[in-house]
């Protein structure tokens, strides 16, 4: 557990990488990628300060918005008891660098918050487009009921693993050869697309800031305000995950190279 903000590398967990690589070789191993809980997100164009040239959101203000929700007792869906809290932030003082990191994060965590921030950041580089784009209504985020919050990359991996399992089972049965050949032909096309996705995920990493804690939300709220990234980073997108077990999301965070 970090208990404060730290620079991290966002990438597939070692276990997920091994499982994927084995599946591509036809070696199957049990590995659950599912995650349950709730999540909230903020970015420049949803909670930032609008100025003539663009929308700006510092890490401090992004954290304030999320931390406030941790002690929002009026929200009926606020999680209770000890919870895993994982917050992943992309932030920069330079919009080009912000876009570049969001592009990488999107491959691993295609969360709506990161996708929206990327779209708006790209559009805002052109003043004419900035005048035309419709920004979201400024609002306080709300907790949803606990649900499946499995990252998009994990969903892709689950699909790939299911396909590999189906093929392996078919190979082991005594089905007619024609049926097996038909399955192989259909699988070949899927495998080609899947292999491209797998290679991209296996080789993608992004520079992020992360906060990780397992505690009561009141305590997490105070810890979240420690060592916040510098306020000169005016472009910020941040997603907070809360659940009883966020091991699969924590596993995607690894020490940044110094």
UniProtKB/Swiss-Prot annotation:
Q: What is this protein called?
A: Uncharacterized 28.3 kDa protein in lys 3'region
The opening ranks of the lineage are: Viruses, Duplodnaviria, Heunggongvirae, Uroviricota, Caudoviricetes
């Amino acid at each position: 557990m970090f208990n404060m903000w730290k620079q991290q590398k966002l990438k597939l967990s070692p276990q997920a990488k091994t499982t994927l690589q084995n599946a591509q070789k036809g070696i199957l191993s049990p590995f659950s990628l599912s995650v349950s809980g709730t999540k909230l997100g903020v970015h420049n164009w949803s909670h930032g300060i609008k100025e003539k040239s663009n929308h700006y959101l510092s890490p401090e203000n992004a954290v304030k918005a999320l931390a406030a929700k941790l002690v929002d007792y009026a929200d009926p869906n606020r999680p209770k008891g000890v919870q895993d809290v994982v917050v992943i932030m992309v932030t920069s003082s330079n919009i080009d660098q912000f876009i570049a990191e969001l592009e990488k994060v999107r491959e691993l965590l295609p969360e709506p918050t990161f996708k929206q921030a990327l779209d708006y950041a790209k559009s805002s580089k052109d003043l004419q487009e900035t005048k035309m784009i419709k920004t979201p209504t400024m609002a306080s985020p709300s907790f949803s009921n606990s649900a499946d919050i499995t990252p998009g990359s994990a969903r892709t991996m689950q699909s790939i693993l299911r396909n590999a399992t189906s093929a392996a089972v078919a190979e082991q049965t005594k089905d007619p050869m024609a049926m097996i050949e038909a399955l192989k032909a259909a699988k070949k096309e899927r495998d080609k697309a899947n292999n491209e996705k797998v290679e991209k995920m296996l080789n993608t990493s992004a520079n992020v800031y992360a906060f990780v804690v397992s505690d009561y939300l009141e305590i997490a709220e105070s810890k979240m305000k420690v060592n916040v990234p510098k306020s000169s980073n005016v472009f910020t997108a941040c997603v907070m995950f809360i659940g009883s077990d966020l091991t699969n999301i924590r596993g995607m965070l690894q020490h940044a190279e110094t």
